[in-house]
Amino acid sequence: MTEGAITEGRDAIQDLRSHPAAHSDLAQLLTATGQDLARAPDGKGSPVIFRVAVEGERQDLDPIIQDEAYRIARELLRNAFRHAQAGQIEAEIRYEDSTFRVRIRDDGKGIEPEIVKAGGRGGHWGLLGMRERAKQIGAQLEFWSEAGAGTEVELSIPSSIAYGAARRGRFRLLTRKKTNP
């Protein structure tokens, strides 16, 4: 129990200290995070195969949305590497016209339905914190899990929110160029 509290405290401090650059690519950030977690010196289990897949044409994300999406995905990756006992973990980023999606999936032991429904285990704030972050940015966070069949979690953000500020900024630049001779 003490070790868990220390780990959660260390993660909270890292969250406060780490701010991904607004112009960093989300796929690169998640790749680096997954590689770091795969190298974690816990010595438990066999190596995990980790990959990041990107679908669709990359679009600039609103910097706040990108930061929150990264923080949620990072927490999901931490949970998968620490608790799933998975052989494979994948992060999938999908740039769609109507929705921006980030999915984290593993082939591990799964999460008990009661834990997902309750929003987490007593004394643990990871699932609850991710749901709150998602809600604050107008996103949905959905969990699918079966005992022994792994877990998949999807963060979905409407494109008007995910790409909104970036698109509006480009429009302002285009408008400004047209009005200035």
Identify the residue ranges that each predicted region occupies.
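Coiled-coil dimerization/phosphotransfer module
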Residues: 1-181
